[in-house]
Amino acid sequence: MVNVPKTRKTYCKGKECRKHTQHKVTQYKAGKASLFAQGKRRYDRKQSGYGGQTKPVFHKKAKTTKKVVLRLECVVCKTKAQLSLKRCKHFELGGDRKQKGQALQF
């Protein structure tokens, strides 16, 4: 279980800052894949018509988790940076802080 606070004071690479400032932390989410990317256009063209599946469908999945990527936005200059964490099964953003002698809850 990884619990990350919603704000973090870290170095900002922005032209105005170039020093440690407060950053807003959010979790990165991949954008919607474009229908007009060259690979997708080629794939759709190849798939059209008769003949079934033309390219191999990947089945041998090895990983059970994904690496968590944090998106850090500077409060001062709005510059965004990304920071990857290690793999984890449970990720929480801005959850309650841990108390001593308390049982873990999911």
Curated annotation (Swiss-Prot):
Confers resistance to cycloheximide, an inhibitor of polypeptide elongation. InterPro entries: Ribosomal_eL44, Ribosomal_LSU_eL42, Ribosomal_zn-bd. GO terms for cellular component: ribonucleoprotein complex; ribosome. Keywords: Antibiotic resistance, Cycloheximide resistance, Ribonucleoprotein, Ribosomal protein. GO terms for molecular function: structural constituent of ribosome. GO terms for biological process: response to antibiotic; response to cycloheximide; translation. This is Large ribosomal subunit protein eL42. Belongs to the eukaryotic ribosomal protein eL42 family. PANTHER family: 60S RIBOSOMAL PROTEIN L36A/L44. The keyword Ribosomal protein applies.
